[in-house]
């Protein structure tokens, strides 16, 4: 687009020079106009090539405006829209940080477009075409965030040896729960800090009974989940006995 605008400016400049030269010497107007236009094009040729090279690096359309918040007009009125699978962590680990940065903004634009489409479908009380596209985009963005966090953690472990981005320690609060306490800088020493000294990183003896009850509750919930899973497996075995036999034969 920049190259075409530059060519248009060159054409207007050549036409202006032709008109000026025709006023001075009508006979030499055509020759001087051609020479001036050729000289302008010759001077601006590297700029045109540089503009073309810059255009190849762009990934979005300029002067698109608010149209990017809406779906492609080809998909308007369609009940189903074809879409690919979401990006997995294994695929994203093979990409560079620059590619992940570009992909994040592409997914962000796609998510904004799908959210606009979802809101418009709710307003018109119509089903959204292919709502799984939004789930795939959200999963892809979560995977990109996860891969970037993995790289940051690996770099921090290499440089400082710390697992967490902010240093801290595992401590027990007054309710007997083990929590991660984040360290922070204070302008005064800890033994002079009244706010810090009001915090209790220990549990009193009467809390032990409630700790035991909490552990029993958690164990009871896990046992209930396991029994429910076994009941579901028994129902499936009774409903599809041939599959259970094939599984036993394959395991043997």
From Swiss-Prot:
Q: Which top-rank group of organisms is this from?
A: Eukaryota
Tell me the compartments it is located in. Answer: Mitochondrion
Family matches, as InterPro entries: MRP-L47_sf, Ribosomal_uL29_mit
GO BP terms, alphabetized: mitochondrial translation
This protein's GO CC annotations? mitochondrial inner membrane; mitochondrial large ribosomal subunit; mitochondrion
Show the ranges annotated as biased composition (Basic residues). 230-240
> Which intervals of the chain are annotated as region Disordered?
230-252
A single Gene Ontology MF term assigned here is: structural constituent of ribosome
Glycosyltransferase is among the record's keywords: no
The UniProt keywords, alphabetically, are: Acetylation, Mitochondrion, Ribonucleoprotein, Ribosomal protein, Transit peptide
A Pfam entry, by short name: MRP-L47
Q: Which residues carry this modification: N6-acetyllysine?
A: 146
The main location is: mitochondrion
Keyword Ribosomal protein assigned: yes
The Swiss-Prot or TrEMBL record describes its family as follows: Belongs to the universal ribosomal protein uL29 family.
Subunit organization: Component of the mitochondrial ribosome large subunit (39S) which comprises a 16S rRNA and about 50 distinct proteins.
Name it: Large ribosomal subunit protein uL29m
List the source organism. Answer: Mus musculus (Mouse)
């Amino acid at each position: 687009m920049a190259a075409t605008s530059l060519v248009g400016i060159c054409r207007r400049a050549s036409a202006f020079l032709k008109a000026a030269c025709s006023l001075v010497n009508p006979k030499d107007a055509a020759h001087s106009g051609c020479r001036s236009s050729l000289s302008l094009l010759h001077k601006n040729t590297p700029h045109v090539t540089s503009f073309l090279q810059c255009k190849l690096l762009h990934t979005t359309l300029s002067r698109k405006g608010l149209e990017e918040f809406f779906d492609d007009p080809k998909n308007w009125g369609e009940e189903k829209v074809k879409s690919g699978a979401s990006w997995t962590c294994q695929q994203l680990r093979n990409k560079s940080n620059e590619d992940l940065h570009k992909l994040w903004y592409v997914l962000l634009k796609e998510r904004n477009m799908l959210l606009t489409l979802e809101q418009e479908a709710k307003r018109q009380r119509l089903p959204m075409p292919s709502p799984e596209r939004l789930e795939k985009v959200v999963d892809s963005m979560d995977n990109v965030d996860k891969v970037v966090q993995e790289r940051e953690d690996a770099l921090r472990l290499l440089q400082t040896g710390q697992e967490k981005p902010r240093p801290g320690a595992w401590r027990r609060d007054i309710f007997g729960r083990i929590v991660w306490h984040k360290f922070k800088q204070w302008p005064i020493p800890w033994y002079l800090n009244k706010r810090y000294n009001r915090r209790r990183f220990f549990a009193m003896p009467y809390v032990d009974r409630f700790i035991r009850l909490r552990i029993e509750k958690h164990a009871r919930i896990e046992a209930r989940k396991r029994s429910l899973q076994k009941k579901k497996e028994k129902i499936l075995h009774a409903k599809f006995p041939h599959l259970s036999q094939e599984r036993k034969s394959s395991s043997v």
